[in-house]
């Protein structure tokens, strides 16, 4: 059985041979492919009337394929193009009656040759300009209307339908095609409201274009873009229905991004809806890999009352806020909360919730970021509770990897009496901290900042040789030589007073202290050190002494 071509099937036409129709061979460039059967009785796609399967089966025609196509809901799109009123849109769409301005162009009657196409183009240009205000008023601003009309007209040029095809019909066809696609889209959207197992199911589904679009029609490609834009502009209710709830949507990567977009770009109602949906699950979403971003966004845009509601839920149980602060994702929410709280009530809630777990916050990487945010965004008076805890637990905090860093920030952010108390406590324990893998950094910090350095020197006096031979303590001694000139004579005297000075020269750490002392000291102090080094010139070829003698520091 022969089939007529489908509108838009241009890519496949080249693979078929033009055999003509009704005994008239096609030699024009207009037809470029399918065998166009003129038998309107046996071709179901050219028969605009209801297909009489009984008579065809009686004539021995195999209707298997047609019946299968009917079950697949594949209809004759050509009939849709020429008989709008025959499709009722299942109660949603009513076809419009075609209205023609003037008579049809003679180039559309019967076979269309090259000259006819040329005349048709001229006629189309004239009619397009003449009817521009009426037939094309709904497409103002689209400079490609003429080319689209020409494309649709040439596509239907070989149609033997006596009703012909004019530019007005092109416009109507395009209107009908877009409205039909919109109708199909609405049906598909209604179907997509059924809850799916996968939260991404809604986004993975796409509205199938008309069957003729598979042939590569440019007009239908444009329609597909239009449909995509409509999908992108879906409202919050539609998106939430596809996931089932805002809670489930917030725990999905793509869904959370969409919700953040609604919070950023949506109206007040959208923000209120999202807030009311997540407020009861703010603890779980705040520690979720994706949900925490939505909670942060809500904290930024919500008002003080809503922000207080979030804070009340995060502090509803003792130690809960500390637990969230230590969480890899929850710490971001707490930090954002600290950045945005402004009222005394909110700050009081934060302070009272963090105090019970202070040591945990100082020792943990995520927790110390929360403390740093408090130091940065709270006033010195509001940070008093942090500085008091830092002073009280100075050694416990300073001897941890992250705690020593937080204490350095506490020193820099503190002022007045709290600053003095904290520095005095660090200086008082400087000998112990100087020998610690992490505490030595805190001692070096206050030496560099020259805060409490005199007290540090007092605590280290008499222990410079011991510290010089240690991996961590040697760094503290070098810092004293560099930043406190008054300490140099005391340090050198302790070094040269050692009975086995050669041992210090060959020590992997002490040799660096001696090099630093030779470069920083002057006068009598330096002369005494050089004299001591010369006595061990026979050691200059040893691995560590080689560095001292190669620099010729002792010869200056």
From Swiss-Prot:
One of its GO terms (biological process) is regulation of translation. InterPro entries: ARM-like, ARM-type_fold, PUM-HD, Pumilio_RNA-bd, Pumilio_RNA-bd_rpt. The keyword Repeat applies. Its main location: cytoplasm. Residues 215-556 form the PUM-HD domain. CDD domains: Pumilio (cd07920). Signal peptide: none annotated. Pumilio repeats lie at residues 238-276, 277-313, 316-351, 353-388, 389-424, 425-459, 460-495, 496-531. Keywords: Cytoplasm, Repeat, RNA-binding, Translation regulation. It is found in: Cytoplasm. GO terms for molecular function: RNA binding. GO terms for cellular component: cytoplasm. The keyword Cytoplasm applies. Sequence-specific RNA-binding protein that regulates translation and mRNA stability by binding the 3'-UTR of target mRNAs. PANTHER family: PUMILIO HOMOLOG 11 (PTHR12537:SF131), RNA BINDING PROTEIN PUMILIO-RELATED (PTHR12537). The pumilio repeats mediate the association with RNA by packing together to form a right-handed superhelix that approximates a half donut. The number as well as the specific sequence of the repeats determine the specificity for target mRNAs. This is Pumilio homolog 11. It comes from Arabidopsis thaliana. The gene is APUM11.
